[in-house]
Amino acid sequence: MAWLRLQPLTSAFLHFGLVTFVLFLNGLRAEAGGSGDVPSTGQNNESCSGSSDCKEGVILPIWYPENPSLGDKIARVIVYFVALIYMFLGVSIIADRFMASIEVITSQEREVTIKKPNGETSTTTIRVWNETVSNLTLMALGSSAPEILLSLIEVCGHGFIAGDLGPSTIVGSAAFNMFIIIGICVYVIPDGETRKIKHLRVFFITAAWSIFAYIWLYMILAVFSPGVVQVWEGLLTLFFFPVCVLLAWVADKRLLFYKYMHKKYRTDKHRGIIIETEGDHPKGIEMDGKMMNSHFLDGNLVPLEGKEVDESRREMIRILKDLKQKHPEKDLDQLVEMANYYALSHQQKSRAFYRIQATRMMTGAGNILKKHAAEQAKKASSMSEVHTDEPEDFISKVFFDPCSYQCLENCGAVLLTVVRKGGDMSKTMYVDYKTEDGSANAGADYEFTEGTVVLKPGETQKEFSVGIIDDDIFEEDEHFFVRLSNVRIEEEQPEEGMPPAIFNSLPLPRAVLASPCVATVTILDDDHAGIFTFECDTIHVSESIGVMEVKVLRTSGARGTVIVPFRTVEGTAKGGGEDFEDTYGELEFKNDETVKTIRVKIVDEEEYERQENFFIALGEPKWMERGISALLLSPDVTDRKLTMEEEEAKRIAEMGKPVLGEHPKLEVIIEESYEFKTTVDKLIKKTNLALVVGTHSWRDQFMEAITVSAAGDEDEDESGEERLPSCFDYVMHFLTVFWKVLFACVPPTEYCHGWACFAVSILIIGMLTAIIGDLASHFGCTIGLKDSVTAVVFVAFGTSVPDTFASKAAALQDVYADASIGNVTGSNAVNVFLGIGLAWSVAAIYWALQGQEFHVSAGTLAFSVTLFTIFAFVCISVLLYRRRPHLGGELGGPRGCKLATTWLFVSLWLLYILFATLEAYCYIKGF
């Protein structure tokens, strides 16, 4: 019973080897002339036993002599078999380039304007290609290109005569995908974990079409016109492909009847199979991974693309917050790199990415994500080590620092500072200055001043003063200007003995005026207690500011001590530490003090988009003057009659008392952090997988082709550090280095947005597929296997191995099962509609133009199609049954259920291979 403990994949390979061995012995027996005890089924011996007479291939000729000895035959079988494996490796590697071009093509983005429920609009970028459409067209073509092209090349290369290799490969590949790949995906999920299909509507559509595709094949072969494919049958088969894509897109976008059906699908509760629910639904139930009615907010339609963009931003913000908590010692750049690798590793990936990853890890090209992370780290470290040594600047810059000055009217004089920066500090420099009137007038408010500032060798700054005139007249704040001009350097004389030519060749030191070369001086009146105000009525602050500082200005006077109360007032932003800390208190302005600062703590919520407001309000200022002015302004004085002198004094006191100015209330608008928003946007752009799998130049491709890298898993660590290559990596690299270097000549994916790489790659895949078809046919005829059996067993297996590893990786790494098994059904349907539909349409049209019919043998293919359709019904039914609550999803679940499902699917595949082989050799009767 020890064999029961073998893993399903190992068991599948074991059975595969046994079947191959039996078929090989059968071929040798047939070649040796043994008649055997083959039951009579009404078919001739050649049809039942297969033929050892090899035919000319599309590219490869026949290997002569045609009837070799047993030893030579075994040698030829080994050569053909090894050549097949090597060609399969080559196809996998060029398919890697092909899928990279598809990833780049489907990652193209365009700008859209999204209208929010509140009427605001925002511009963002979304992908041009719909995910469902790309999966059923380019992605399916990329993963199934060898099968599709083999069918087309076989028909066209053999004079438009139907062959068994192409169609049987498509059906055999569909069986391998449906049973073996899904079985492996079910098993590899850790015990107790599950994976569900997210886009269930799309899965229903593609599953239905995949079943219909093979039913349709049977109807063409055995019902409508047995043994003949007419033109309308071929064209209609091909036409089903865009119809399938269109219906899947309608289901994904919820168009037509989906738009009016706020439903989910559900079978009877008593049967327990909860697929989706219909009718009324509780709040928060998901359909296809999206909230029900989530696209209707306040009666307005919000595009689903906008919601997906917002979801991406929220996920990126969550990653940044988590990493910041785990690694508080890291700076922002380090956190960005870590978040980039984490997001790339954990985001939902396309089928193309998993196919590329599987091929590269299998051929010693390494883990794409780890290589990308290592390259980014090296690039960052090299950038930090670059020090640009700028040549010495011979130009000296002269300017005011600072450029704005304030002084009280009674200060006497104001000092201004001139600064020299750069150039030759050993020279003496001169710069002229002159005052200019603004609202303040020379002679009345300040003293007109002009002169020259001398900066001696080694001096970097110099001060000069301008006199301020004081008066007892109450007036507004006034200002004037001071302008620099005519900067020059003292002329230098040549040293004794220095030739004039050498002296004249030396660079002359230069000096220029730099901004700011004009200073503004504001004179504050000191004959008034002051007008208290904010600088403006609205201020925008970033949520990451921490503690914001707001200035309260005292203008039009600064006499006496004044207390100004203040407090924060809630708006849409809430206090109490939710959005900001409640702040209140009093500002005490001393005599001649003109500026005070209010500090308010802002809570950083790290939101991508934020706009909330609160207010800071100033109360009535209180004059702390204890003279006659304060006495006359007190409420007690109003009870008695004032004398003429007191009335005049009170009028003057009223004019000079402190009051609130133009902006007594400040609105503070809290916005998202620009740096944080930019970081999130940058991360979203950097986490585009097209940047990881794509190439930018031929140099990059050749360097990658000759480099050995470690294959490791993404789950090993979060740092993204590369490991050293293993022995297996080196072996696979040297086995495939010829293909890698050859296919490095394919145009990089950056050219023509990936289309150049797409076109060249598909041409190369077609050439290699033609060779594979010839090798497979010659391999089969050498050992006496029929083309239909060779296709179902060998060719289908060889073309599906990369997809197997890709689906396994997708099942383990993705949250949902769409990338691992959701694309299997769609790919199977596309194989029939494109692979068989295109080939048969071309052949049917060709023979129709010749006035003849296109004949296709219905027997073996019709039997295989019928058998696969029955088994596919069983497989899909089991997958839907696994959505019961106690199992939870198509993949994973309890260990016993996993094993049972996997064994069932593997057994279905083995039965399919067995029955198809027995029917081909007439051991059982087909159609």
From Swiss-Prot:
Gene Ontology MF term list: calcium:monoatomic cation antiporter activity involved in regulation of postsynaptic cytosolic calcium ion concentration; calcium:sodium antiporter activity; calmodulin binding; metal ion binding
Domain of life: Eukaryota
Reactions that this protein is recorded to catalyse: Ca(2+)(in) + 3 Na(+)(out) = Ca(2+)(out) + 3 Na(+)(in)
Stretches assigned to the Cytoplasmic side: 95-147, 191-202, 252-726, 776-778, 850-860, 925-927
Gene Ontology CC terms: anchoring junction; axon; axon terminus; centrosome; cytosol; dendrite; dendritic spine; endoplasmic reticulum membrane
SUPFAM superfamilies on file: CalX-like
Residues the record lists as binding Ca(2+) 3: E409, D471, I473, E475, D525, D527
Binding, Ca(2+) 6: D579, E606, E607
Matching InterPro entries: CaCA (IPR051171), CalX-like_sf (IPR038081), Calx_beta (IPR003644), Na_Ca_Ex (IPR004836), Na_Ca_Ex_C-exten (IPR032452), NaCa_Exmemb (IPR004837), NCX_ion-bd_dom_sf (IPR044880)
Residues binding Ca(2+) 4: D445, D471, E475, E478
Tissue expression from the record: Isoform 2 is expressed in brain and skeletal muscle. Isoform 3 is expressed in excitable cells of brain, retina and skeletal muscle. Isoform 4 is expressed in skeletal muscle.
Region described as Putative calmodulin-binding region: 253-272
Regulation (activators, inhibitors): Calcium transport is down-regulated by Na(+) and stimulated by Ca(2+).
Chief place of localization: membrane
UniProt-annotated binding residues for Ca(2+) 1: E409, D445, D471, E475
Annotated GO biological process: calcium ion export across plasma membrane; calcium ion import across plasma membrane; calcium ion transmembrane transport; calcium ion transport into cytosol; cell communication; cellular response to cAMP; cellular response to hypoxia; hematopoietic progenitor cell differentiation
Domain named Calx-beta: residues: 386-485, 519-619
Region forming the signal peptide: 1-30
Residues annotated as binding Ca(2+) 5: E543, E607, E672
Phenotype when changing E612Q: In a breast cancer sample; somatic mutation
Alpha- repeats: 140-180, 796-832
Glycosylation sites: N45, N823
Family the UniProt entry places it in: Belongs to the Ca(2+):cation antiporter (CaCA) (TC 2.A.19) family. SLC8 subfamily.
Function as written in the Swiss-Prot or TrEMBL entry: Mediates the electrogenic exchange of Ca(2+) against Na(+) ions across the cell membrane, and thereby contributes to the regulation of cytoplasmic Ca(2+) levels and Ca(2+)-dependent cellular processes. Contributes to cellular Ca(2+) homeostasis in excitable cells, both in muscle and in brain. In a first phase, voltage-gated channels mediate the rapid increase of cytoplasmic Ca(2+) levels due to release of Ca(2+) stores from the endoplasmic reticulum. SLC8A3 mediates the export of Ca(2+) from the cell during the next phase, so that cytoplasmic Ca(2+) levels rapidly return to baseline.
Subunit structure: Interacts with AKAP1.
Entry protein name: Sodium/calcium exchanger 3
Organism for this UniProt entry: Homo sapiens
